[in-house]
Amino acid sequence: MANITDFRDFQAFKACRVFTREIGLLIRSVPLRRNRSLVDQMERASISVLSNFAEGFERDGNAEFTRFLSFCKGSVGELRAQPIYCVDIELIEQERYEALDLMAETAARLLGGLTRYLKTSNKAGRKYVRRSQPIPKRRRRMSVKGRA
């Protein structure tokens, strides 16, 4: 992980992206569009998956990244359950559900593996890396008192 500088480079993020894209295609299908509350919930959960991954990574510390990965994995779980409901009320076919479930399982497994790695890593994250040169001090803005 030491060489990863962008959250989009993680295999876990890529798997989540594939899964949420398929969920997006699913919720645009005609039978499902009629169930607006379900569509809204699935859209929010899909957005949450990718957003929490990115937000956690950008916070720079492994502890925070791990916490946001947990939120991300929770949203994957939510999205894994909602197609079950869709099958039960005959909005989607069992085969489509099984394909989605496999994608969700892959994403959750990769998120879990990344979380375990971060928890056992002796590195604290980008936030705590010592820089070879000091960070330059910010310049103070000059006061413009007396100017009209």
Spans of features found by a protein language model:
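Amphipathic alpha-helical assembly/interaction segments
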Residues: 1-148
